[in-house]
């Protein structure tokens, strides 16, 4: 932050391999400590890769949760309206390169969020075989649809 970052994102890349009790005992206390020690004015995001327990993730103290394909975005937003969500277009769809499927997945994600507290992103980064054409189509599709808060 002192060097110019605008947000802090904590990555828990092995979360998808953790059972809830393990996550709760070992990962969550670390997440809580990190977020508690951040200045409250600093936006923070928790990325717990493909972890579905939103209640545990929300208790971390992060202002935003990056969610993958295992989370229904519209339900997440209803359950935790005070949080911001990031995600959750399936990165495998982008990698496969079918432009119609990329459009459908992107628009579906945007519709699920209804323009509320959402940062459009992939479930977990670009896969190595993803073409530039697919990435550009994802970006252009997202720019073509504007959803405003009502």
Region spans (language model):
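Active-site loop segments of alpha/beta catalytic cores
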Residues: 1-150
């Amino acid at each position: 932050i002192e060097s110019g970052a605008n947000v802090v994102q904590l990555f828990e890349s092995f979360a998808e391999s953790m059972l809830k009790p393990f996550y709760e005992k070992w990962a969550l206390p670390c997440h809580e400590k990190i977020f508690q020690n951040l200045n409250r004015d600093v936006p923070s995001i928790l990325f717990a890769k493909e972890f579905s327990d939103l209640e545990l993730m929300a208790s971390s103290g992060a202002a935003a949760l990056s969610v993958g394909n295992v989370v229904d975005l519209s339900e997440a937003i209803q359950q935790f309206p005070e949080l911001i969500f990031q995600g959750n277009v399936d990165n495998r769809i982008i990698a496969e390169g079918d432009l119609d499927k990329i459009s459908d997945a992107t628009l579906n994600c945007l519709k699920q969020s209804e323009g509320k507290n959402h940062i459009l992103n992939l479930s977990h980064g670009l896969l190595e075989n993803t073409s530039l054409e697919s990435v550009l189509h994802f970006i252009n599709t997202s720019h073509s649809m504007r959803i405003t808060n009502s």
